[in-house]
């Protein structure tokens, strides 16, 4: 591995993995160049990045960060980094797999917010929707409850004012 190009690639991989809490290992074999380009674009739109490199280099870079994915790095593999929206990136992978009859790319495993996860967890993340969608749903739920709470407080205030007014008369 003393080859200069491999050393540069390894350094670049380590730099890319700095501060990354969520990533997925995927099998991309069977995608056409056009499909791979579209996948990269979709992932980039969700704040992620698709990295294709030799498994040995990917594994070395991951192991330096204390993350062992030797079991998932078999056959052609790519690393999908989810910097901003882990669920959105997982959904982009799921959508891309749904657009072709072979279900490619195939998720082999992942690392979500500091924990190694299996394929089922990544699929569950993909079904959640994007971060902004989840935030909008949360705001909607909270505002509905706050509105009800304000109504209750208003009714209680009116009741107290009514009792206070009848006592002074």
From Swiss-Prot:
GO process annotations (BP): translation
A single GO cellular-component term on record: cytosolic large ribosomal subunit
Gene Ontology terms for molecular function: large ribosomal subunit rRNA binding; structural constituent of ribosome
Record-linked SUPFAM superfamilies: Ribosomal protein L10-like
Keywords: Ribonucleoprotein, Ribosomal protein
PROSITE patterns per UniProt: RIBOSOMAL_L10
Family: Belongs to the universal ribosomal protein uL10 family.
Oligomer and partners: Part of the 50S ribosomal subunit.
PANTHER family for this protein: 39S RIBOSOMAL PROTEIN L10, MITOCHONDRIAL
UniProt xrefs under NCBIfam families: PRK00099.1-1
Protein name, UniProt field: Large ribosomal subunit protein uL10
